[in-house]
Amino acid sequence: MIIFFSIVTFLRNYLMQTLDKLDRHILNVLQQDAMIPLKELSEKVNSSVATCQRRVQSLTDSGIITKRVAVVSPKAVGRTISVFVMVEMDNQHSYYQEQFERKMRQEDEVVSCYEISGDYDFMLLLHAKDMESYHAFTRRVLTGEFHVRTYKSLFVMNFTKADSGIIL
C-alpha cells in the first residue's frame, strides 16, 4: 500500500512539474469559463486552436482536469439554505466510512463531502430547499444506521467567496 501511495505522489509531483506556462494559462482560463470555445481560448492564451485542443485533451487524460461544470446559484434554483455539517462517526472502521461516503454521493443536497482530521470525521456542504427539507435530510441520513454518533450544523449566513478555482 505504501508503494502505491508513493507512486501516486510521485506522479502527481511529476505532473505538476511538467505543467508549463501555457498549461497553467489554459487551466486558469478554463477555471473561469469551462465552456469557452477553443478559438477564444487560443486567442486568450496566444496559441493555436490545435495546440489548445491537444493541451486540453492531455490535461484531461492525465487527470489534471477532472470535469467541466457550470456553477449554479443555489438560491436561483430554490435551495435557500446552505449548511456545513460536521459529522462524527461512532465507528472509524473503513467499511463504515466507505458506506457513509457512498450514501453522501447519492444525496442530491450534498455538494461536498470531505473526510477531515480533528474532532469530526467528515465535513459536508449541502444546499437544502428549506429548513423542513434539511430536517428531513438529518432524520434520513445522519442516523445510527450510517454510524453517525453526532453532527453539528453550521448555517451559512452569507457567501463572501465561493470559488472552486486554483490560480496557477
Swiss-Prot record:
It comes from the Bacteria. Keywords: DNA-binding, Transcription, Transcription regulation. Residues 38-57 bind DNA. Residues 19-80 form the HTH asnC-type domain. GO terms for molecular function: sequence-specific DNA binding. GO terms for biological process: response to amino acid. Gene3D superfamilies: 3.30.70.920, Winged helix-like DNA-binding domain superfamily/Winged helix DNA-binding domain. One of its GO terms (cellular component) is cytosol. This is Uncharacterized HTH-type transcriptional regulator HI_0224. It comes from Haemophilus influenzae (strain ATCC 51907 / DSM 11121 / KW20 / Rd).
